[in-house]
Amino acid sequence: MRYQKLEIQEANWQWKYLLKKHREGENITKHTEQSLIELKVQFLTTLQHSPAEIEQWIKAEMTAEQRKRMRQSIRAKRKRFFNAEKLTTKKKSIDLDYASWLRLSKYSKTHAMTLSETINHLIDERENQHLYSEQMAKMKASLKDLLK
């Protein structure tokens, strides 16, 4: 396993995930009767600081498909959480005008690169172009000196 699972943290993420889904109007239990769902969710709200009981609630009250979706969401959250600890893997964001983003996106698609790779590629090209023009200017100057 690449990212360490911390039981208390995982349970807290699961608890928050379930309550968020419930607030969004999604059924987080295997039950269909509204009063029973409310009762089960009400019980879940009391379990915030009980990781073992949260796990038992999940096993008892959720369908396999619901558990699978929750696990995928928690796995993604765990990855983002641990990647955010290191500066090299932490995601950064930049603001682009739509037209700039569109041009960058088209360029990256035609060259089969990600947006990050495309930005690096364009910067490298520009730096190489600058070095080339400097070298050409030096060569022209030295040729002029030789011809004098």
From Swiss-Prot:
**Quaternary structure (record):** Homodimer.
- Family according to the record: Belongs to the MatP family.
Q: Which gene encodes it?
A: matP
Q: Kindly give the InterPro entries that the UniProt entry links to this protein.
A: Arc_rbn_hlx_hlx, MatP, MatP_C, MatP_N, MatP_N_sf
Segment forming the signal sequence: none
List the GO molecular function terms: sequence-specific DNA binding
> What organism does the record attribute this protein to?
Haemophilus ducreyi (strain 35000HP / ATCC 700724)
Compartments it resides in: Cytoplasm
Query: Where are the coiled-coil regions?
Result: none
A single GO cellular-component term from the record reads: cytoplasm
**What role does this protein play?**
Required for spatial organization of the terminus region of the chromosome (Ter macrodomain) during the cell cycle. Prevents early segregation of duplicated Ter macrodomains during cell division. Binds specifically to matS, which is a 13 bp signature motif repeated within the Ter macrodomain.
The name this protein carries in UniProt is Macrodomain Ter protein
What Gene3D superfamilies does the record point to? MatP, N-terminal domain, Met repressor-like
Q: Which Pfam families match?
A: MatP, MatP_C
